[in-house]
Amino acid sequence: DYYMEDKTKYTLEEAKERDATYSTRLHVKARLINRETGEIKEQEIYLGDFPLMTESGTFVINGAERVVVSQLVRSPGCYYADEFDTKTGKRTYTSTIMPLRGAWLEYETDGNDIFYVRVDRTRKIPVTTLLRAIGLVTDDQIRALFGEEAMIEATIQKDPIKTGEEALIEIYKKLRPGELPTVDAARNLFSGLFFDNRRYDLAKVGRFKFNQKLGLAERIKNQVSATTIVDNETGEVFVNAGEKISEEVAEAIQNAGINIVDIKYLDRTIRIIGNGTVNIHKVLPNVDLSSLHFKENVNYEVLKNIIDNTEESQLVSTIKQRYEELVPKTITTEDILASINYLLNLSHGLNKSDD
C-alpha cells in the first residue's frame, strides 16, 4: 500500500524560481515477516519525492519544465524500406538486419542499382564482398544462386574484390582501420562478429521474426511456380510449372527442405530464397517431441544431419543436445542470403516494406 501527500514542498512557481522539482512525498507501507516466529511488523516508510504532472502535462525538474517522450525501440528482426530518389527517378531500397546484441547488417541500393552493405555500421562495401566472405567466392557462384538479377550483376561489375580472402581482408580493414590485416585474423573477426553466441544474440523474438519474414513458404504462397517442384526424397510432385502454389503446398515445399523456388511474376522469372528452416513436427510427425517444446522452425541442414546419423531410439535425446544448433541464437549464412534475396524481391514489387 502507498500514498502521496497532498501538500507539495514548493508550489509550481516556487519550484521554477528555486530550480527545484515540483513533487510530493511518497510513503509506502512495508511489512516484515519473521518466518521462524510468525511475527509480523508493519511500518510506514518515506520512500522519496515523486514528481507531479502539471495541468499542462509537463513536469518541473530542477526548475526546468520537461515532457516525457516515449522512446520506441525496435525488437530484433529484419526491416525493409524504400523511397523515391528524385535525382535518378528510381526507387532505392534499404534494410536493417538487427540482433538484440551484436553487429548490424545494413543494406542499401543507389540510383545506379548498386547494392551495398554496411557491416557493423562501418563504411559501405558492395554486397558481393559480403557474399564472397560467407562462401560464394566467384562471380559465377553468385550468379548461379541469385539467378538473373540486374542489381547483382551491376554490383559484381562494381566490386573490385574477387576472392573470399580478399573479401575478409576488406571487411577487416573497415572494422579495424589502421591495423595490419592477416587472413586468419580477418576470418576470426568475421566469424566472431556474426556466428559466435557470446557476441551475437537474436533472442527468441529475433529468431521468430527472422523465420517469419525470411522463410520460404510465406513468400511463395499464392504465387505461380515457374518450374515443376519435386520432393527430392520421395519424387512427389508438389506443383507443376504454371500452377499456383497454395498455402498448404508452400508449407509442404519448405518442410521438404527445398529452399529455392522460381516464380512467375509480371511476365518474368523471379527467384525466392528462403532461410533454410523447417517445421520439425512436420518433418518428424511420428516422433514424440512434446517434451522439447519446439515453437520455432529449425535449421533444416542440422536436422537432416541428425536424422541421417542417429538411431531412431536416440533421436529425441540427440535433438535435445543439439537444440542450439537447430534454433541458433546467431544469424546464419542462410539468413544472410535470404535477407539479401528479400531486398531483391522487394525491388521487383514482391514483399512489403516495413516503413
Residue ranges and their predicted role:
Residues D1-D355:
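N-terminal non-catalytic structural scaffold regions of very large proteins
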